[in-house]
From Swiss-Prot:
Protein name: Leucine-rich repeat and WD repeat-containing protein 1
Keywords: Centromere, Chromatin regulator, Chromosome, Cytoplasm, Cytoskeleton, DNA replication, Kinetochore, Leucine-rich repeat, Nucleus, Phosphoprotein, Repeat, Telomere, Ubl conjugation, WD repeat
Matches recorded under SMART domains: LRR_TYP, WD40
Native source species: Homo sapiens (Human)
Described function: Required for G1/S transition. Recruits and stabilizes the origin recognition complex (ORC) onto chromatin during G1 to establish pre-replication complex (preRC) and to heterochromatic sites in post-replicated cells. Binds a combination of DNA and histone methylation repressive marks on heterochromatin. Binds histone H3 and H4 trimethylation marks H3K9me3, H3K27me3 and H4K20me3 in a cooperative manner with DNA methylation. Required for silencing of major satellite repeats. May be important ORC2, ORC3 and ORC4 stability.
Coiled coil: none
GO biological process annotation, one example: chromatin organization
Sequence segments annotated as region (Disordered): 204-267
Localization of this protein: Nucleus; Chromosome, Centromere; Chromosome, Telomere; Cytoplasm, Cytoskeleton, Microtubule organizing center, Centrosome
Length: 647
């Protein structure tokens, strides 16, 4: 399709007319239009146009100054749009469709909400559902930028040139003012720049009024946003909600047990944590009465920059997967699959090349559960871009390989672990996965853990029948393999065959495992154990320490580790979080295991309010912290996500 012509517009316009100025509705969908085909000089003649359909084309941007000031309905679905700021030229827009533009993210949705205060519907849904989210973000950013302005102005000397100082302020605000999740950083920095420039402009108008410093006017008042979050592409068979109902529970003050001072073993002082948010975001049918949905797994999104840390966590349970910002407690995304029960989630980061040759970083979330399907979610764009029919039975757990960002392990109740290569999305932004290996197990695999020192060579799994290891090197000819070594945790006739339902590497050598003995978590050396195996198929682990845990006989409480901080975490049957600082063991492993070590501290269940009563007790199925240990997320058996923050 070449450039548009007046004749084509009259052919596809309604009502039929030989004058462009009388057309009120125009359908330009499916014409393979490029951005340069939209001629502002031609389109501005559509002075009465109220409805425009540009769906199913190849548009990367919308030209400025199209002159369609009366436009009320705009459809831009299934294009290649990467920016939405040009939409501000349509101040009367009421309905907007943007689904199927894979490079638009939640940041663009928020920009749309801010720029178009008259919007009523986005992608066919009520656009006012997330009003409070954008409003709260804007209010907090305005407050922080204003405080930064006052601090900045107080440091200026009288001799400093005002123009240069004000330009420096805008740069420093964009660099230093932070709020909200990393996934919203594009929107927040965009707003910070706008607010900063408004403050600078306001200060210039006041220079002649007074010499004494005054508090800057409320920034952004002329652009009070309508906070509406647009939901992007949704598969027809699996609805996606980007504006889930979120129920926060008020909580009395939490009780924390454990000494907050340095121990005699030389460990660091215990960190202080406080409960921040309690969310019911996995409720069946979005019912606030649901205190029964079991939540099973959570994982923090990988940081976008090396050395940084993430505050965005994915949680799963029931028929929903949620992505939550730990700082604000906002549910950023919610993916629902009716009839599914999600058991596991895992993140990876992929570099995708667009049709225009640009590179984009995608955070991809894999989620799986009862139906044996793996769903690959492009979280920031908000849609499912692939489904792997991985197993005929339920998937208990999954994880990505640290060595290969596209390699995904899935472990199922069919007693198989399969290694997949999910690849990178094609031009239609769909994954085409291929199967690389099948690993047979003698019992149901519960936890997967690539060996930290050689993740592309060995895989550990905690199973109903014990702890096993497989050779996963891809340069070997066999594509179906059995367990190479089984690890046992004690001597005697009952040494093997015991469930291992918790497994994590604390560093490249030391493994934390749970389930082999009641009331204990075992720390053992991979290097020493593997080095002493010889040709044996059953090997006793070299135990370095045993950590005291709950004496419950209940199973399936998953443990996790925070390697950067030398911390091991595990929930229990009463809603508590057991925290162990094992940094001293990592620095100097003991020659012989010492006596059972007590936890560094126990975070007692804070007993939040729900349905007008206190939730006095629950089971914490899993607990995970981000790399810097600033946030901790605990998932319960009673549909409550508990988020703790470091004080």
């Amino acid at each position: 399709m070449g450039p548009l012509s007046a004749r084509l517009l009259m052919q596809r316009g309604r009502p039929k007319s030989d004058r462009l100025g009388k057309i009120r509705s125009l359908d330009l969908s499916g014409l393979e239009l490029l951005s340069e085909h939209l001629d502002p000089k031609l389109l501005c003649r559509l002075t009465q146009l109220q409805e425009l359909d540009l769906s199913n084309n190849h548009l990367e941007t919308l030209p400025d100054n199209l002159g369609l000031s009366h436009l009320r309905v705009l459809r831009c679905a299934n294009n290649q749009l990467g920016d939405v700021t040009a939409l501000c030229q349509f101040p009367k827009l009421e309905e907007l469709s943007l689904e199927g533009n894979p490079f638009l993210t939640v940041n663009d949705n928020l920009k749309v909400s801010f720029l178009l205060p008259t919007l009523r519907k986005v992608n066919g849904k009520d656009a006012s559902s997330t009003y409070s989210q954008v409003e709260n973000l804007n209010r907090e950013l305005t407050s922080r930028v204003t405080a930064h302005w006052e601090k900045f102005m107080a440091t200026l000397g009288p001799e400093e040139e005002a123009e240069k100082a004000q330009a420096d302020f805008v740069k420093s605000a964009v660099r230093d003012v932070r709020y909200g999740p990393e996934s919203l950083s594009e929107f927040t920095q965009w707003r910070v720049r706008m607010i900063s420039e408004e403050l600078v402009a306001a200060s210039r108008t006041q220079v002649q009024k007074a010499n004494s410093p005054e508090k800057p006017p409320e920034a952004g008042a002329a652009h009070k946003p309508r906070a509406r979050l647009a939901a992007l592409k949704r598969p027809d068979d699996v609805p996606l909600s980007l504006s889930p109902s979120k129920r926060a529970c008020a909580s009395p003050s939490a009780q924390v047990e454990g000494s907050p001072v340095a121990g005699s073993d030389g460990s660091q002082p215990a960190v202080k944590l406080e409960p921040l948010h309690f969310l019911q975001c996995h409720s069946k049918n979005n019912s606030p009465q649901d205190l029964e949905t079991q939540l099973w797994a959570c994982a923090f999104e990988p940081a976008w920059e090396e050395g940084a840390t993430s505050q965005t966590v994915a949680t799963c349970g029931g028929e929903a997967v949620c992505v939550i910002d730990c700082q604000t407690g906002i549910v950023l995304h919610k993916y629902k699959a009716p009839g599914e029960e999600f058991f596991s989630v895992a993140w990876t980061a992929l570099m995708v090349v667009t049709q225009a040759g640009h590179k984009k970083r995608w955070s991809v979330l894999a989620a799986a559960g009862l139906r044996g399907l793996v769903r690959l979610l492009h979280v920031r764009a908000g849609f499912c871009c692939g489904v792997i029919r991985a197993h005929k039975k339920a998937i208990a757990t999954l994880c990505f390989s640290p060595a290969h960002e596209t390699h995904l392990f899935t472990a199922s109740y069919d007693k198989r672990i399969i290694l997949w290569d999910i690849g990178v999305p094609n031009q239609d932004y769909e994954f085409q996965a291929s199967q690389l290996l099948t690993l047979d197990t003698t019992s149901i695999p519960l936890r997967l853990c690539p060996v930290a020192s050689c993740p592309d060579a060995r895989l550990l799994a905690g199973c109903e029948g014990g702890c096993c290891c497989w050779d996963v090197r891809l340069d070997q000819p066999q594509k179906r393999r059995v367990c190479e070594v089984e690890f046992v945790f004690s001597e005697g006739s009952e040494a093997s065959g015991r469930r291992v339902d918790g497994l994590a590497f604390v560093n490249e050598d030391i493994v934390a495992s749970k389930g082999s003995g009641l009331g204990t978590i075992c720390l053992w050396s991979w290097r020493q154990t593997w080095g002493g195996r010889g040709s044996q198929s059953t090997v006793a682990v070299v135990v370095l320490a045993r950590l005291q845990w709950s004496s419950t006989e209940l199973a399936y409480f998953s443990l996790s580790a925070c390697p950067d901080k030398g911390i091991v975490l595990c929930g229990d049957e009463e809603g508590n979080v057991w925290l162990y600082d094992v940094s001293n063991i990592l620095k100097q492993p003991p020659l012989l295991p010492a006596a059972l070590q007590a936890p560094t501290q126990i975070l007692k269940w804070p007993q939040p309010w729900a349905l007008g009563q206190v939730v006095t007790k629950t089971m914490v199925n899993t607990v995970v912290a981000n790399a810097s240990f600033t946030y901790l997320t605990a998932l319960t058996d009673s549909n409550i996500v508990a988020i703790w923050g470091r004080m």
